[in-house]
């Protein structure tokens, strides 16, 4: 059992030697990749060491119990510990999403429901910012279009983590958030106290570590500049600082007007464009990544909800995993961990099942 770990241990030892080489740290891109892989393998090696020790301990206990019944009392505890250790190791050996250790760019857009939808989009942004803070991630709003009543029509925010462990990566957690989020509550503008249903859409992209990862031909870009506008469409800038970049081969369009500088808006637009192109390239190379990404788009286009936020009942429900809890107030303040963990667990169960059938 776990014969494949032998090769992973050898790879782990090789990476450990590489990390002691000063030349590695002169190449930030390679150094980052080596550190990430080393952190991932370290978890596997530690789990395997624990499993091997428990296996040996159980075997020894059984041999001793055959000679002296007094040792038999230790066997049930060791068997349970070995079972838990084996399950932990099996999960660690599930092939990971190669993007798990990446940072992420999230887009939140108002959907059905007009002004209430825009207000809910703002609430979702607040929820994710609080969640990021609880995980000690950095959050940067790179583009935001507000509504007349203080809500959000569209916002793009970049989340950056510090852990080299893929299991703790930003993308590893936020990738499950793509889709339609539905809210049920009494809007502040509702005088009759009736519950309204509205929705907001979320898209998530893995962020490109280095610009060189995604090759972009400058000749494929159409760049338009215009004056930035505020709620209602009124101009808020007297110079052409806003930027719209169209990538001709894919038709992807990214607009930025958050910064006062045209250069800063252009850099931000290119940052988002690279993330979207990376996602598209990976879709074309990986059928699983393609299906995952199409799932985000499909749910948004068909208005299929992935999650419902019911304020009158203080209830949150994830319709993909069956997760349900009555602590919506805490979730909206950033206590999103258990909801996302239910998605991670469901994903792992699916991957384990696929491994068993292969």
UniProtKB/Swiss-Prot annotation:
Positions carrying N5-methylglutamine are 234
Keywords for this protein: Cytoplasm, Methylation, Protein biosynthesis
State its location(s). Cytoplasm
KW GTP-binding (keyword) present? no
- A cellular-component GO term for this protein: cytoplasm
Per its record, what are the GO molecular function terms?
translation release factor activity, codon specific
This protein's source sits in the domain of life called Bacteria
Functionally, this protein is described as follows: Peptide chain release factor 1 directs the termination of translation in response to the peptide chain termination codons UAG and UAA.
Q: Which PANTHER family match?
A: LD18447P
Which family does the similarity line name? Belongs to the prokaryotic/mitochondrial release factor family.
The protein in question is named Peptide chain release factor 1
UniProt source species = Leifsonia xyli subsp. xyli (strain CTCB07)
